[in-house]
């Protein structure tokens, strides 16, 4: 028995509303939380507002999240007391964006596999949104002042595009959307560049029998370059070498070589 499309839409809307409520409650409860990385992102956001690009372009901190913070600070112009709550408002906006991208991904999966069969569609919708809320609040953590939620959004969106490519949608528009997702994902965090190789390789493999697939993948790469290229060029000029970021060096030192994260405190 097929689940009526209107019923599925209402259920989806209800689950999305519940997810937004959970996100809003968590963002409000953590509105005064802050940690060291968040302070650095705020410093970069303030540099962006001053148009101090020498300070804003940084090989360790990626630019997309500070740009969101700068936009919010520029719009609301909060006092010192309200500055951190505005930061968590940005986190909630990032959470809502991630929710929309997750919906796009889940809709693609369900439309290809369940065709609104009841109760399967209802069960998978409920399970999917429950996992999204849990992972966003506990693993990605909406309370943490970081770009991780924007990275999650880009991965959800790219995954949704890949699902549609696997299903046979090989249009230029879908490959353009893949480039947009991966380009902004890189601006959120540089490691998305490595993920981009995986996504583009899978897209190429799954659409390999489609005439003109190379041109479509090249379109994805071109759009990525248009989005990320200016930042890479500025960063490379500032660093004196071609680079997409240097955060991997510190993380390799901390997590592979086990270099102490903090200097000796004298105890």
Q: How would you label these PLM feature ranges?
A:
Residues 7-36, 131-136, 185, 222-237:
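Transmembrane signal-anchor helices characteristic of membrane glycosylation enzymes that use polyprenol
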Residues 30-43, 55-72, 78-85, 240-246:
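Extracytoplasmic catalytic/substrate-binding loops of multi-pass membrane glycan-assembly enzymes
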Residues 1-24, 107, 115-126, 215-223:
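Start-transfer (signal-anchor) and selected internal transmembrane alpha helices
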Residues 2, 195-225, 232-233, 238:
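Perimembrane helix-loop-helix junctions
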Residues 116-119, 158-174, 185, 203-207:
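Membrane-interface transmembrane helices that cradle and orient dolichyl/undecaprenyl
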Residues 134, 161, 173-190, 200-201, ...:
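Membrane-interface alpha helices of multi-pass inner-membrane proteins
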Residues 89-117, 157:
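Transmembrane-helix motifs of polytopic, lipid-linked glycan transferases
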Residues 36, 61, 137-150:
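Short acidic/glycine- and proline-prone juxtamembrane loop motifs at membrane-interface regions
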């Amino acid at each position: 028995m097929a689940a009526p499309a209107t019923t599925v839409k209402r259920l989806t809307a209800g689950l999305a509303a519940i997810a937004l409520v959970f996100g809003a409650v968590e963002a409000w409860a953590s509105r005064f939380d802050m940690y060291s990385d968040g302070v650095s992102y705020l410093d970069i956001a303030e540099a962006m507002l001053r148009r101090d690009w020498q300070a804003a372009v940084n090989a360790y901190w990626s630019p997309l999240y500070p740009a969101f913070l700068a936009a919010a600070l520029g719009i609301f112009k909060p006092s010192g007391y309200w500055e951190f709550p505005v930061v968590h408002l940005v986190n909630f906006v990032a959470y809502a964006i991630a929710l929309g991208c997750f919906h796009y991904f889940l809709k693609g999966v369900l439309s290809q596999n369940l065709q609104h069969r009841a109760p399967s569609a209802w069960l998978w919708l409920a399970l999917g949104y429950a996992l999204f809320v849990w992972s966003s609040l506990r693993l990605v953590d909406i309370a943490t002042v970081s770009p991780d939620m924007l990275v999650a959004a880009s991965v959800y969106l790219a995954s949704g595009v890949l699902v549609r490519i696997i299903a046979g949608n090989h249009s230029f528009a879908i490959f353009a959307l893949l480039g947009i997702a991966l380009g902004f994902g890189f601006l959120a965090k540089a490691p998305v560049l490595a993920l981009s190789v995986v996504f583009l390789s899978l897209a190429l493999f799954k659409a390999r029998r489609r005439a003109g697939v190379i041109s479509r993948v090249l379109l994805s790469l071109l759009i990525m370059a248009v989005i990320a290229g200016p930042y890479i060029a500025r960063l490379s000029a500032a660093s004196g070498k071609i680079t997409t970021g240097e955060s991997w060096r510190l993380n390799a030192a901390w997590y592979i070589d086990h270099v102490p994260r903090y200097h000796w405190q004298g105890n």
